[in-house]
Amino acid sequence: MMGMELSTSGTRKIAARRRQIAMSPYFGKPDFSGLGEVDAGRPKLDQVSLADLLRNGFVYPPHSILDNVKLATFGFNPKGDMYSAPEFRFSFRDSGKRKDADTGQDWIGTYHRLLCDAYSKSCAEMKSPWLLQSGGKDSTPLAIAAAEIRPDTTCITYLGGNEENEVGSACYVAQKLGLRHEILVCDPGRAYDRYLAIVERMPLLTADFALLSYVDLATTISESGGDGVVDGMGSDNYFGTPVDRQHRWLSALARGLRLPRFLSELPVIGRNFELCYLLSTLQMHPIERVFPGSRFTDAEVDELFGRDIAEQSKARLALFQSEFASATGPDELCAMALTVAGATGGFAKGLFTASALSLRAAYPFCDPDLREWVYRQVPLDQLIDPVTRTSKVLMRKHIATRFGELPYITRKGSFRFDLCGLARDRFEQVHAYALRTRKVLPGAARWLERNRDRLDNKYHASKFSLLAVVLPWIDTHSRPL
């Protein structure tokens, strides 16, 4: 187990041994084994990184939850010094994409071949791969490849709640392809117990909104004899991310205001998700509104810590501002922002969980041959439709060679976990963690007590889930050696 002390500055009497890890599926498998070596140097909790987690659900790279462990994620040079000279460059600029229209080449056939190769390579060391299968536009091409290359793949689908039911589409895809298919219905208490069972082995910390569902799935896979998880993340960066009118409007509303706390606690507002979401948006930085999920406001984060710290977290955006400022439009800016968030958010949840459960994690869409071909060779109109603004045109055409229009591709909800159920079932447990970690977050218990009656609103329940993830990790990893 890794011991830890608190750190509020870069100055300390005994310097802990510094570690730097290349952590991105685009770079290959990350090596977390070196984290055990930092025990001798008394690694310390980076409190600004903790503020990152509470404000955004992830730690701004190249930082990690530990102040002497830096992460070279995609966009950074893994051979560079992440302590003294980190420099972020987005690798899939629009300027590098092919501008001419479709020339009649067999784009679908080439895409299928490269995807099958990517699937085969990424799962080569797995004896029993399990594919996270939603029946949507990312996981369905992987299922098509699996049926051809690794028919021993098992598909598994998570039923997280009423808002986002992927089961029908996923079952149809798996059955038509002849793949075994399993369904895991969300039980928030079970998922949380599974997280607590592995939290001591989680090498670092993220608070991605899908972490608990991922842990639930990965534990089921492990208990069922699977030795690897196949994840459909990674294609958004190079296919592109079209920004719709709603998200442009929300970014425009993000003004970085400091609003009084009582507004979100008024009876009319406090129980209304949409109004709470709108109020929180007004208090965000425009870039940070792009990041998914509902999080603590800056004022709430300062209250949780009992001192001003949110501005130090927000200041970490400065590292990315020059690259953001050079974006040619909202789509490219969104892709840049999501690359930053996904590195230590979406990707991290899988990498950390797989490490804790001794599973292999595969990300076929991050394969260098596949991604470079799509980015540099496929025409723009096959990435994003210039008229309809439909995303991943080539991927959809690939799916259409086997299936008609899949329901989950056209209708997508917002939450994949029963957040309100978690708050209802595990409030006392999380409150106890808040009391045990009050030296780190002295305001956490008070926030829980004040908002207990509002946790049937998924806006407040989302914040509860952040504390539910963060507090046990702090409690476990901050014990003396």
Language-model features, listed with the residues they occupy:
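Mid-to-C-terminal catalytic subdomains of enzymes
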Residues: 7, 11-20, 37, 229, ...
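Phosphate/ATP-binding catalytic cores across multiple sugar-kinase/actin-like superfamilies
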Residues: 107-131, 220-224, 341-349, 471-479
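Extended catalytic-interface subdomain
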Residues: 207-208, 230-241, 279-288
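Short, flexible loop segments at boundaries between secondary-structure elements
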Residues: 248-282
